[in-house]
């Protein structure tokens, strides 16, 4: 909850905490990643735990986060002029579904996206987010599955939507 507050300027509700935890847990398995190598090297050299984590996090650059940032930009471009005020309320997104075809490569998973199925299953259970429902319906419409990065983007936009609409955060906060 504190991490979401730091980014969005408001605490999430129970559902917001649930989806934030799903997003964070998507990155727990670091097997074969440069971040794990940096953390292990830092740990072996006797650094404190916070230095170990800082070293690993410092490895995560814009290039690694770019697919999720692109998905956030795509979702934002689809919904930014909509009348959607509550990201967990009721909203008819048929118009956005029809407009989303140009973002197919950004929003749908490639064959090597191993986390996508598990994450989609978790997010589909008791889905309240308009953005997550939209993403799942778009994938179904296109005969694919949403990418992990697109689901991370949908979670982030769900958490930040009210703050964005009330101008507590900017579009840049959502897309960078």
Q: What role is predicted for each listed range?
A:
Residues 1-176:
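Hydrophobic alpha-helical bundle cores within soluble ligand-binding/oligomerization subdomains
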